[in-house]
Amino acid sequence: MWFLILFLALSLGGIDAAPPVQSRIFGGFNCEKNSQPWQVAVYRFTKYQCGGVLLNANWVLTAAHCHNDKYQVWLGKNNFFEDEPSAQHRLVSKAIPHPDFNMSLLNEHTPQPEDDYSNDLMLLRLKKPADITDVVKPIDLPTEEPKLGSTCLASGWGSITPVIYEPADDLQCVNFKLLPNEDCVKAHIEKVTDVMLCAGDMDGGKDTCMGDSGGPLICDGVLHGITSWGPSPCGKPNVPGIYTKLIKFNSWIKDTIAKNA
């Protein structure tokens, strides 16, 4: 599982500790500049770790398995190495993983049929509110169930090399379809539950992967998921990726934000 590879690499003190995997957004393209203004880059110290989504000026949503001990985020970034005056840097004052996410599964182990990565989401409260601009904008949570067969867009800075984890310079986008959960049940040994979405290209070649975790899955123009987990190597035929199904967590997200305002 590729998110476990990333987590273990970070916990060992460096990205270069990751074993060989093919890990990037496959079959994607450079996102049009500033076309994903809700996209967040989540760092551990000064190393890029995961994607995220800006929900409002004070809160970022990401994956629970992106939990670390020292967060900082960038908003409004397109390219990691270009000077982008419109981008905003923020520290994080509080991290709140979903209480039902099983953090013990992040320990190194052989995947088992009983492994359940449900509830893979976490809220980050910014130490200073984001300035809402043309290139930094929040996105709304979904208000209804996503439709099977919807065209979805995922984005992130997943690795561009198959051996050493190295984020893409430019924000990458990829399009694929929302699939029945049964397709993912057949493809994965780990549990696929009703709080997950199954999405990808059954022909292979289009996928999210290590480094894309926590980033948005937008189907028919609506934020419906965040990248959670998938196969390693990524982009395999008949093995779609798994995304946290946000409609199932609207109440928890809103209640948590209200209690920690």
Curated annotation (Swiss-Prot):
Cysteine pairings via disulfide bonds: 31-173, 50-66, 152-219, 184-198, 209-234
Signal peptide stretch: 1-18
The protein's Enzyme Commission number: 3.4.21.35
Key words, A-Z: Disulfide bond, Glycoprotein, Hydrolase, Protease, Serine protease, Signal, Zymogen
Catalytic-site annotation from UniProt: 65, 120, 213
The reaction(s) this protein catalyses: Preferential cleavage of Arg-|-Xaa bonds in small molecule substrates. Highly selective action to release kallidin (lysyl-bradykinin) from kininogen involves hydrolysis of Met-|-Xaa or Leu-|-Xaa
Glycosylation sites: 102
Record-linked InterPro entries: Peptidase_S1_PA, Peptidase_S1_PA_chymotrypsin, Peptidase_S1A, Trypsin_dom, TRYPSIN_HIS, TRYPSIN_SER
Keyword Disulfide bond set for record: yes
Top EC class, one word: hydrolase
Domain (Peptidase S1): residue spans on this chain: 25-258
Biological process according to GO: proteolysis
GO molecular function, one term: serine-type endopeptidase activity
Propeptide, residue positions: 19-24
Family note: Belongs to the peptidase S1 family. Kallikrein subfamily.
Chain's role: Glandular kallikreins cleave Met-Lys and Arg-Ser bonds in kininogen to release Lys-bradykinin.
Protein name, as recorded: Kallikrein 1-related peptidase b5
Organism this protein belongs to: Mus musculus (Mouse)
Lineage: Eukaryota, Metazoa, Chordata, Craniata, Vertebrata
Gene, per the UniProt record: Klk1b5
